[in-house]
Every structure is written in structure tokens, then in C-alpha cells.
Amino acid sequence: MTSPRRALVLVDVQLQYFSGPLEIHHPPHADSLPRITATIDAAEAAGIPIAVVQHSSGDQAPVFNPTMPEFALHPDVEARRRPEWKAITKRFSSVFAETQLLAWLRAADVDTVTFVGYMTNNCIIASAVAAEELGIDVEVLSDATGAINLANSAGFASAKTVHSTLMALLQSNLAAVAASGDWAAAVEAGQPLPKDNLPTSAVAGVARSARQAGQ
């Protein structure tokens, strides 16, 4: 089995997500942030290259405004930042859209990106989808990402529902999903994370639905 050539991508671990209407609620950022920093430490120890991404909506925007304090990285991430990290500022949901990330990954001979950060329901899912056509394998760490509560004209979904649903969706086709501790063990062993696929997920979904209907 070929060992993945990984890069860790820190997606928008910005202060914008730690208070206000965009505050991460599941997993709570009090839980996910320590998992993010532990993953950074594990990547550094293993010599895995790191890219740090910040979202900007422009200096007239009410959120993700680079002139406002909330644009900054969380201090626990900023304190670990090293000059060799690749710094990316994006304006679209995907970390690949109109950024230098792909070129940096190619130059480093990376074939697998590990995503941690926020939000599961926007930039993580968008980036995982974009990676497919680029031929980049994706890992998403379920306890080092997070979602918000959502309500709009189409309905309501709690952050827990959003996050757990998207983890199952990602694992079914677009990514290998795991907890940060399992990822660290896979890194140490030089192994890829296990990944399911759409047909087996569909078969298992039918069986699970039938069992629940029979209860």
C-alpha cells in the first residue's frame, strides 16, 4: 500500500467563527480547536507541509473583512505559525478557487490533503468537491472541523445534524473521514485512512433504514 504524500490545510480558523452568528456549534469550537492544534503539532512532527487559509470578503464586507479583528487566525493557531507555511487568502468557498494552493501542492509532490477548520457546511465540503477533479485525495478530520445551525426558506438543520450528515456524505465518496487521533496514528504508520464508497454506503443505508422501519 502506497504511503500518502500529505499536506495539512488549515481552513479559515479565524476569529469570525468563535462568536456571533457564525460561531461554530458542532462540534463546539472549545472541542474542535484543541484537535486542530494537536493536528498541527502532529503534522509538524511528521514533516508534513502546512498551508494556512483565510477567507476574505473584502474591506467593505460585514464579515471576513481583512480590516477587522475577526479576520485574524485564532491565537492558538497563530502562535504555531511558521515561516515555511504556505499562506493563502481566498474569496470563494473552495480553497482551490483562484488561489495558489494547487500549484504549491504540485510543487511539493502532494497527493493527499487533510482538511481541518471551518465550516463543514461551506468551505470544507466545497473544497472536497473541488479536489475530486484535480486528482487530489482528501481527508477530513471530523473532530477538527465544525458546522453552524442553519435556517432559511428551505428549512432548518441543527449544527449537529449538518455536521454528522456531511461527514457521512463525504465518507461515501469524496473523502476519508476520521477523528484526529486516528489520523495521527495513520500518519505515524505511513498509511492512508480507510475510505468507503457510494455503492457500499447505499447498500448499508438501505439495510439501516429497513432495520429502523422494523423497530
Model-assigned labels for residue ranges:
Residues 1-7, 34-46, 63-215:
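Active-site-adjacent betaalpha module
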Residues 14-19:
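Short acidic, Gly/Ser-rich segments with clustered Asp/Glu that frequently serve as metal-coordination loops
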Residues 22-29, 61-64, 155-156:
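Short glycine-enriched, charge-decorated loop/helix-capping segments at active-site entrances
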Residues 43-58:
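Von Willebrand factor
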Residues 2, 20-21, 58:
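Glycine-centered flexibility motif
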